[in-house]
Regions:
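Short aromatic-enriched loop/helix-cap "lid" or pocket-rim segments at secondary-structure transitions
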Residues: 16-20, 90-91, 190-193, 241-245, ...
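Mid-to-C-terminal alpha-helical segments outside catalytic/metal-binding sites
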Residues: 2-6, 15-76, 105-113, 134-138, ...
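Divalent metal-dependent hydrolysis catalytic cores, especially in the metallo-beta-lactamase
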Residues: 48-54, 66-90, 117-125, 146-150
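Catalytic pocket-lining loop regions of alpha/beta-barrel enzymes
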Residues: 112-119, 130, 135-294
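Short glycine-enriched loops at secondary-structure junctions
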Residues: 82, 126, 182-187, 277, ...
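Active-site-proximal, glycine-rich beta->alpha crossover segments in alpha/beta enzymes
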Residues: 60, 81-102, 109-115, 125, ...
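Alpha-helical scaffold segments that form or flank carboxylate-/histidine-based iron centers
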Residues: 6-8, 94, 124-131, 156
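Charged helix-capping and loop-helix junction motifs
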Residues: 96-103, 160-166
Length: 340
């Protein structure tokens, strides 16, 4: 197997001062304090949870990313934001538009123009759907983004609501991906947890399950048959849960679906980021096949270069996955999803 892997989900450590240089009037001279709302009140070092060496380094930029790709034998990465994971929590539509435009210009200038190994998803201001459609079009056609991120939390309506369907129609027309990315845990039932890792353990997969379930039952994948949507950084164990619960609702709860719940995961419509050491991965493949699953490094968040190599090797050395499954997970599926 080639060692040219694809990293389906890496992260930018945003430079707020640099992004400021791309902000248009009237917001450009308002300072950099509180650019982005907090992900939640859980992401704080005050709980005493230690961080591994080499993770969450704010100095990581395009050059460090290229070094990471070279050292891990990775063909390219697709970059998601860090503070921008809270983008759904932005309350002011005008600021959402201004920040999305500035962030996308920043990523285009600092990362995309630096190397084709650095791909990225755009931010789009879903607080104003017409502006989100226009920014998605600009990001993909003019700036070279592979698609855009959908917030996992914070929007005033569920991501499956028809209000957002013009965005899905435009993504389908552009033949670009969209992806829901976990990371914002507010109002998900974790407010009384006293240990942050417990919040993160459940706070990553549950918003993905909520988003995917809504998009299935509200008919998004039926209305837009060519739409590709990713669900990132929540692992794979939530997939059998969603399928089994929807099956029961179809059987006994009056839920009407055009297809069996499993079928939505089998036809290149839904893609899912995964880690190398997930025991649930083999069972998820047994249920829906290998096509949805994409290896994701999460660098430079909880993962260092050494951790990433360990997880790649864990995929390669697994005895419960076929050779063709490993090839799909480590590159083929991501290339198909991102169109690169």
């Amino acid at each position: 197997m080639s060692n040219h892997y694809v990293d389906a989900d890496g992260h930018v450590m945003e430079d707020a001062d640099d992004i400021l240089t791309f902000v248009k009037p009237p917001f450009h001279n308002r300072g950099t304090r509180n650019w982005m709302p907090s992900l939640d009140h859980f992401h704080t070092p005050a709980d005493g949870t230690p961080r591994a060496p080499g993770t969450f380094d704010p100095t990581i930029g395009p050059e460090e990313w290229l070094q990471f790709l070279a050292q891990t034998g990775t063909e390219y990465t697709v970059l998601y934001p860090t503070t921008g994971l809270a983008f759904g929590n932005v309350a002011y539509p005008q600021w959402a538009l201004a920040y999305a435009q500035a962030y996308n210009e920043y990523i285009h200038t600092r990362y995309l123009q630096r190397s084709p190994q650095l791909q990225a998803v755009a931010l789009i201001p879903m607080q104003q759907v017409p502006e989100a459609v226009a920014e998605l079009r600009r990001a993909v056609q003019d700036l070279g983004f592979v698609g855009a991120m959908l917030p996992s939390n914070g929007l005033t309506r569920h991501v499956s609501h028809p209000e957002y369907w013009p965005i899905y129609a435009e993504a389908e027309r552009l033949n670009c991906m969209l992806a829901v990315h976990g990371g914002s845990y507010m109002n998900l039932g974790f407010n009384t947890y006293t240990v942050f890792p417990a919040t993160r353990a459940l706070g990553m997969p549950f918003p993905l399950a909520i988003a995917a379930t809504g998009m299935i039952v509200d008919g998004v994948f039926d209305r837009f048959p060519q739409l590709r949507v990713g669900f990132m950084e929540g692992g794979t164990a939530w997939i059998p849960l969603v399928i089994d619960r929807l099956e029961r609702e179809v059987a006994y709860g009056g839920l009407k679906l055009t297809r069996h719940p499993e079928e939505y995961f089998k036809d290149d419509r839904i893609f899912v980021g995964c880690e190398g050491n997930e025991k649930a991965l083999a069972y998820a493949i047994e249920r829906v096949g290998p096509k949805p699953f994409m290896f994701a490094s999460d660098f430079p968040h909880e993962i260092s270069i050494a951790n990433c190599m360990e997880e790649i090797n864990e995929v390669l050395e697994r005895h419960d996955l076929k050779h063709e499954h490993k090839a799909a997970i480590l590159g083929e599926n991501a290339r198909r999803f991102y169109g690169r």
